């Protein structure tokens, strides 16, 4: 999960700072030309929904965008960053391409074309304030907003680390810590936050200036009979969890695919990457869990499918390269999320499903290693794929001087965990379904979405046929050589 290098300049937050600020003039109080777009009626609601989660006092972003006075100086920068399209640097950071594949996701903060156009017109027409009576009530940011998962049922603190002000990047293991859980519990959400001793708002322009953890790969497991844990040897009660990395938000698991936190487990941080930020910094992570009700057992089991490859051959001084990885689904599968993971040359990833003669592009997304995103599908649009489907991911790479993320495009690049190496992975969540569960899921979807034989639906090749026909087609496909 490493980056190209660990220095502060390589860890830029996708900020709105472009060096351009609209001048503050009385023209801002006038009516907007060509449509009367105003801050109070048109712009404030957009910012509240899609921006203020980060752009607020004590938020991760470098400036607050709550009031008119805070927003107006950044109007032209906001216009530029919201109109970039699904690629690195766009605001809000959401890179799903809207012209292809599934378009129904949970917690989607992206802007519509109409909203992007409104922002542009507002910035170009003098940034009028508008009637204060049109201003929506301000969002409240109380203690509960500190955790996207709501009030956690369990918070575990990792051991403290100390990073010198100027030092090389550090990779290694951090001491494990007991969770204190005395009974098996299923987890429906997990969220990780870094806590450090940096002064508030210091280093706001860069991730490196605000944090020392670039990422942490971790799992939970039960100690062996000698009360010891070998990080290299997963044992009883081992559960893997989403990697904590720069920009990652909370992870929510479908209730029927909740993850098990065994009694007496420890958190095992088996691969951490720390970087210096210009100040000696003491830091630790808080790992928060949200539990399912006691006694709950999830309906589905996690899929064993891993989608990625280590066979990467990224040529020097060349843009528009592709890398591919395939996996065959051993069971009927529901894909809950799509999470591209590349490294510095990575620009974009697509995922497609191959079922017989059908090839469907499920999604394409731009990629920004400064702000890694996962995309959780809405329940009624998560891909439902029959056993034997081939999942194919395509990574689009740029190892040329035009890609400023690459430290030296004259070098050939291969696969690996460290900064100078690369990855091609989909880290999205999947669950396996029995034949009965598969048919049940498709039946519910047919009913809720009013699907017919003439309906085209992406990600569910058998949703528009009868249950008997779906079973027959699955059997026929599996019998083919």
Predicted regions located by residue number:
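Aromatic- and Gly/Pro-enriched helix-to-coil junctions and flexible linker segments
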Residues: 26-185, 189-193, 264-270
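Bacterial N-terminal signal peptides
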Residues: 10-23
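His-enriched metal-coordination microenvironments in redox/metal-binding proteins
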Residues: 142-431, 445, 449, 457-462
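General secretory precursor processing signal
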Residues: 10, 54, 367, 463-466
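N-terminal secretory signal peptides that target proteins for export/translocation
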Residues: 1-7
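Activation corresponds to long, low-complexity, non-globular regions
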Residues: 120-146, 158, 162, 434-475, ...
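Processing junctions and N-termini across compartments
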Residues: 45-48, 216, 454-457
């Amino acid at each position: 999960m490493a980056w190209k290098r660990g220095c502060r300049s390589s860890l830029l937050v996708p900020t709105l700072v472009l060096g351009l600020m609209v001048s503050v003039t009385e023209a801002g109080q006038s009516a907007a030309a060509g449509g009367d777009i105003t801050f109070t009626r048109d712009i404030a609601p957009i910012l509240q929904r899609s921006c203020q989660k980060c752009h607020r006092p004590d938020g991760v972003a470098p400036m607050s965008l709550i009031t008119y006075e805070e927003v107006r100086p950044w109007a032209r920068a906001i216009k530029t960053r919201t109109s970039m399209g699904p690629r690195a640097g766009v605001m809000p950071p959401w890179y799903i391409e809207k012209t292809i594949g599934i378009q129904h996701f949970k917690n989607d903060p992206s802007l519509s074309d109409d909203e992007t156009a409104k922002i542009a017109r507002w910035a170009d027409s003098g940034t009028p304030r508008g009637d204060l009576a049109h201003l929506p009530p301000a969002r409240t940011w109380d203690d509960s907003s500190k955790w996207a998962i709501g009030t956690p049922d369990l918070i575990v603190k990792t051991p403290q680390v100390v990073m010198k002000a100027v030092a090389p990047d550090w990779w290694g293991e951090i001491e494990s810590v007991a969770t204190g859980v005395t009974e098996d519990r299923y987890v429906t959400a997990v969220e990780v936050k870094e806590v450090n001793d940096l002064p508030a708002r210091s280093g706001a322009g860069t991730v490196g200036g605000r944090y020392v953890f670039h990422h942490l790969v971790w799992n939970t497991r039960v100690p062996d009979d000698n009360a010891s844990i070998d990080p290299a040897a997963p044992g009883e009660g081992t559960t893997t969890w989403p990697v904590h990395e720069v920009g990652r938000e909370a992870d929510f698991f479908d209730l029927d695919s909740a993850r098990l936190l065994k009694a007496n487990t420890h958190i095992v941080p088996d691969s951490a990457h720390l970087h210096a930020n210009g100040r000696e910094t003491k830091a630790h992570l808080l790992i928060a869990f949200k539990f399912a009700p006691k006694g709950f057992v999830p309906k589905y089991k996690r899929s064993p499918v891993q989608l990625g490859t280590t066979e990467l051959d990224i040529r020097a001084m060349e843009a528009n390269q592709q890398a591919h990885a395939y996996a065959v689904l051993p069971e009927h599968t529901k894909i809950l999320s799509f999470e591209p993971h590349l490294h510095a040359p990575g620009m974009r990833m697509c995922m497609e499903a191959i079922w017989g003669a059908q090839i469907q592009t499920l999604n394409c997304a731009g990629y920004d290693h400064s702000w890694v995103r996962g995309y959780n599908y809405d329940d009624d649009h998560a891909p439902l794929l029959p056993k034997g489907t081939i999942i194919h991911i395509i990574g689009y790479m740029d190892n040329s001087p035009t890609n400023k993320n690459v430290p030296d495009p004259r070098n050939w690049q291969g696969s690996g965990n460290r900064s100078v190496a690369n990855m091609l992975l989909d880290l999205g969540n999947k669950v396996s379904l029995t034949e009965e569960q598969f048919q049940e899921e498709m039946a519910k979807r047919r009913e809720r979405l009013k699907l017919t034989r003439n309906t085209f639906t992406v990600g569910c090749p058998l949703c528009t046929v009868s249950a008997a026909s779906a079973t027959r087609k699955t059997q026929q496909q599996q019998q083919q050589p």
